[in-house]
């Protein structure tokens, strides 16, 4: 049987890592014994907390050339967010909950995208549809991914399906959703021991928006001001990366996971467009965005709209 590489996006978050592991288990249950989960970056503190809690080993870092290899993408589809050699791979499946952009294949494939808050929610539905066993550790990974992507069900991306899935899984995983979720999110919200470069790259994605390449990074915290006390450090890293990677715009979204608000820091020639997108005036490259927590639903569409007019 041909080996199948399963992975989420670069700079993986908890959903990207968890969904790769879950999908590998799903494929194993279909009889694909050569399916294996990989990762495209370092494990975050939040994700490591989840892996440790449910005694799951992190996926191996993908270093292989994917030319001619069978792959399954989870939690992403855009090629600039995927493995460097993805254009040479044979994409067999995609399981995702994001927009579809910069994606094409030479042949047909199984593509499942749903407007839910988390890829793991789709995978939960797939297990139920096939009558597959959901082991406690798989249930735990599903819950962790849902809580992470929905910020403990507070994000506007969160749907009833996400909540229902987590509720159905909590007894299998033997966790209290509120207590476990808050502990996991706080584990990932510590920033004082991380460099500016690490924080800017920890959860960052690139997007093609019309004629512009935009980089949007997000940092979760319990104290926005503490993070942005290091504004000059962040700006230096963001400007250097923009020059090296040819980003037209770089946006750092610092999100308060307790109060569900964010502040943004923006660099780039088109930064005034970001103020226009949110109908705010940038002050020294920064602005407060009340109620904004979701990059996918509350940041990317708004900036895309002003950059493609």
UniProtKB/Swiss-Prot annotation:
Mn(2+) 2 binds at residues 15, 75, 97, 149. InterPro entries: DDH_dom (IPR001667), DHH_sf (IPR038763), DHHA2 (IPR004097), DHHA2_dom_sf (IPR038222), Mn-dep_inorganic_PyrPase (IPR022934). It holds the Pfam family DHH. Mn(2+) 1 binds at residues 9, 13, 75. It comes from the Bacteria. Keywords: Cytoplasm, Hydrolase, Manganese, Metal-binding. GO terms for molecular function: inorganic diphosphate phosphatase activity; manganese ion binding. Its cofactor is Mn(2+). Its main location: cytoplasm. One of its GO terms (cellular component) is cytoplasm. SUPFAM superfamilies: DHH phosphoesterases. PANTHER family: BNIP - RELATED, MANGANESE-DEPENDENT INORGANIC PYROPHOSPHATASE-RELATED. Belongs to the PPase class C family. This is Probable manganese-dependent inorganic pyrophosphatase. It comes from Staphylococcus epidermidis (strain ATCC 35984 / DSM 28319 / BCRC 17069 / CCUG 31568 / BM 3577 / RP62A).
């Amino acid at each position: 049987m041909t080996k199948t590489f399963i992975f989420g996006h670069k700079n993986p978050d908890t959903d990207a890592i968890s969904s790769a592991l879950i999908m590998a288990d799903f494929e194993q249950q279909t009889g694909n014994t050569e399916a294996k989960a990989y990762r495209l970056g370092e494990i975050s503190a939040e994700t490591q907390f989840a892996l440790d809690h449910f005694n799951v080993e992190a996926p191996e870092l993908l270093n292989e050339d994917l030319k001619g290899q069978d792959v399954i993408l989870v939690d992403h589809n855009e090629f600039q967010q995927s493995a460097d050699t993805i254009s040479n791979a044979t994409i067999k499946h995609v399981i995702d909950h994001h927009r579809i952009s910069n994606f094409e294949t030479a042949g047909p494939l199984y593509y499942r995208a749903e407007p839910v808050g988390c890829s793991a929610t789709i995978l939960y539905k797939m297990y139920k549809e096939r009558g597959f066993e959901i082991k406690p550790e798989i249930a735990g990974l599903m819950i962790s991914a849902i809580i992470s992507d929905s910020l403990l069900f507070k994000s506007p991306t969160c749907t009833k399906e996400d909540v229902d899935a987590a509720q159905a899984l909590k007894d299998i995983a033997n966790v209290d959703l509120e207590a476990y979720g808050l502990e996991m999110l706080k584990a990932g919200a510590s920033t004082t021991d991380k460099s500016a470069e690490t924080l800017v790259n920890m959860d960052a994605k690139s997007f093609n928006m019309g004629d512009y390449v935009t980089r949007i990074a997000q940092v979760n915290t319990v104290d926005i001001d503490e993070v942005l006390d290091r504004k000059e450090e962040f700006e230096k890293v963001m400007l250097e990366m923009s020059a090296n990677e040819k980003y037209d715009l770089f946006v750092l979204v610092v999100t308060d996971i307790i109060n569900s608000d964010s502040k943004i820091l923006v660099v780039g020639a088109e930064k005034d467009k970001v103020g226009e997108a949110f109908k705010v005036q940038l002050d020294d490259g920064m602005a407060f965005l009340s109620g904004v927590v979701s990059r996918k639903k509350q940041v990317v569409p708004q900036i895309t709209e002003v950059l493609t007019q």
